[in-house]
């Protein structure tokens, strides 16, 4: 989808002008990439049924997100320049080579992380773990802007997408 959108669709820009003043914080790339580990607590902490619910929510979010990308493709207004990056150049080079600056809204990075971490927080019996999962998700949300990969609206739309994806799966389970 990202490749198709980059090469074959005209892009829309959806951001507030003041967002371009937000500095790139290079070490937040570590938090950004930690999203790819956010499935681990699910793997170890939820039952098989929990895994199925999350897998279905990921499928629902992928379908809805791709429809949004096709109808209203958005692009990143930040300029990608490795000279602005002091540390972690290899990480940024990898990210910017693999991920075109398109298909931003909703953020799958946020949606995926929320689909993994919100059920973990909900099912955790430890207040400390609930806070941990919430803080991890909040940091991932902030990281997508601080590494100049997304805009602020992408955070909110990613969270909304994850919420509705989890609710749709729950509703189907209860009425199915």
Question: Where are these predicted regions, by residue range?
Answer:
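Core segments of transmembrane alpha-helices
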Residues: 32-39, 59-60, 109-116
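Membrane-embedded catalytic cores of phosphoryl/pyrophosphoryl-handling enzymes
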Residues: 92-176
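Alpha-helical transmembrane segments of integral membrane proteins
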Residues: 26, 30-33, 53-60, 106, ...
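Interfacial segments of alpha-helical transmembrane regions
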Residues: 38-70, 133
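C-terminal TM-helix exit segments that contain a strictly Trp-centered aromatic cap at the helix terminus
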Residues: 1-5, 65-78
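Membrane interfacial helix-start motif at the N-side
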Residues: 22, 46-48, 96-102
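Short helix-capping/hinge motifs at transmembrane helix termini and TM-loop junctions
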Residues: 46, 72-76, 147-148
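N-terminal transmembrane-helix/juxtamembrane module of multi-pass inner/ER membrane proteins
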Residues: 1-37, 83-88, 92-94
């Amino acid at each position: 989808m990202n490749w198709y959108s980059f090469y074959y669709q005209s892009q829309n820009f959806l951001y507030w002008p003041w967002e371009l003043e937000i500095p790139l914080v290079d070490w937040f790339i570590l938090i950004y990439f930690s999203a790819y580990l956010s499935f681990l607590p699910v793997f170890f902490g939820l039952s098989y049924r929990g895994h199925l619910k999350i897998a279905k929510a990921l499928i629902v979010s992928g379908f809805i997100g791709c429809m949004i990308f096709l109808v209203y493709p958005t692009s990143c207004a930040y300029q990608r320049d490795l000279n602005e990056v002091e540390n972690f150049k290899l990480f940024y080079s990898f990210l910017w080579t693999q991920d075109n600056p398109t298909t931003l809204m909703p953020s799958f990075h946020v949606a995926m992380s929320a689909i993994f971490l919100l059920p973990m927080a909900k099912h955790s019996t430890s207040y400390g773990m609930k806070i941990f999962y919430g803080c991890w998700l909040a940091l991932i949300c902030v990281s997508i802007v601080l590494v100049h990969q997304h805009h602020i609206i992408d955070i909110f739309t990613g969270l909304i997408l994850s919420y509705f994806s989890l609710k749709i799966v729950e509703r189907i389970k209860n009425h199915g």
